[in-house]
């Protein structure tokens, strides 16, 4: 019996040790050179393969060119995953492409349309598999909102609304927290009425690192941008400014 218990203990220990640490880095605005550098650092690789997903911007060529311009001079191997493809020319599945990367960065745009395409193409399943493998996931705007349970979006006509995400992170989210004046009030309102759960909000130049689905640290590209933890307590909304590390 003692040997059996020891076996179970060792089996559980090595199984836990073999699981990759899951890293997810979100920021409130668009992709920048600074955020790419930080994502690259999270991989632990000297020259990481980083794949950009411009789905939310309909694979816009100017956005793709901007991505390559940002990566120029950085010690990274830049890739792009396009969804507007033909089987005549693309011979690898989306999953095959993504699983070979060290990091994946999702761009901004229309979150609702992006998620619909991902689900139709099973890219959402490939991203979950990549995340569980330990491939670093990152993104801003639509590219940050998508990872959360739900949050504020401009993906529908007329006004901001609430959208459900992939639920990799079991919190709500608000990007563009102070740069778009209607974001913060809408976020407060929906946390107060419990349409949204507690969650994290980011200014455009601020980001948050989650390790194994939990908050790890807040970073910023300047001293004026911050991230916040927002929740309901005693019938009121509480906003906690997170201690932030400036990155270059």
Report each predicted region and the residues it spans.
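Bacterial Sec-dependent N-terminal signal peptides
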Residues: 1-20
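C-terminal and late-domain segments of enzyme folds
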Residues: 19-46, 61-66, 70-73, 103, ...
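Solvent-exposed loop/turn segments at secondary-structure junctions
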Residues: 30-32, 55-59, 85-87, 110-113, ...
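Short internal beta-strands
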Residues: 51-55, 173-174
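Portal/gating segments that form or line small-molecule/metal binding sites
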Residues: 57-109, 113
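Catalytic-core regions built around general acid/base machinery
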Residues: 97-100, 121-134
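Catalytic nucleophile loop
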Residues: 105-108, 127-150
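Glycine/threonine-rich flexible loop motifs
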Residues: 111-121
């Amino acid at each position: 019996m003692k040997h059996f218990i020891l076996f179970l203990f060792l089996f559980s220990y090595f199984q836990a040790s073999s699981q990759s640490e899951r890293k997810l880095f979100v920021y409130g605005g668009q992709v920048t050179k600074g955020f790419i550098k930080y994502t690259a650092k999270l991989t632990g690789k000297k020259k990481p393969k980083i794949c950009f997903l411009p789905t939310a911007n309909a694979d816009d060529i100017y956005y793709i060119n901007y991505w390559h311009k940002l990566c120029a001079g950085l010690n990274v191997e830049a890739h792009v995953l396009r969804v507007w493809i033909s089987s005549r020319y693309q011979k690898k599945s989306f999953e095959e492409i993504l699983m070979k990367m060290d990091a994946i960065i999702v761009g901004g745009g229309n979150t609702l349309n992006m998620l619909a395409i991902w689900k139709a193409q099973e890219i959402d399943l490939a991203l979950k598999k990549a995340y569980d493998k330990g491939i670093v996931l990152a993104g801003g705007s639509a590219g940050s909102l998508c990872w959360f349970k739900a949050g504020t979006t401009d993906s529908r006509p007329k006004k901001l609304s609430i959208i459900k995400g992939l639920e990799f992170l079991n919190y709500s989210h608000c990007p563009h927290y102070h740069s778009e004046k209607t974001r913060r009030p809408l976020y407060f309102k929906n946390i107060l009425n419990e349409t949204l759960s507690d969650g994290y909000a980011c200014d455009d130049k601020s980001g948050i690192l989650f390790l194994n689905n939990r908050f790890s640290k807040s970073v910023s590209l300047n001293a004026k941008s911050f991230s916040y933890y927002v929740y309901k307590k005693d019938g009121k909304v509480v906003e906690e400014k997170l201690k932030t590390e400036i990155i270059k």
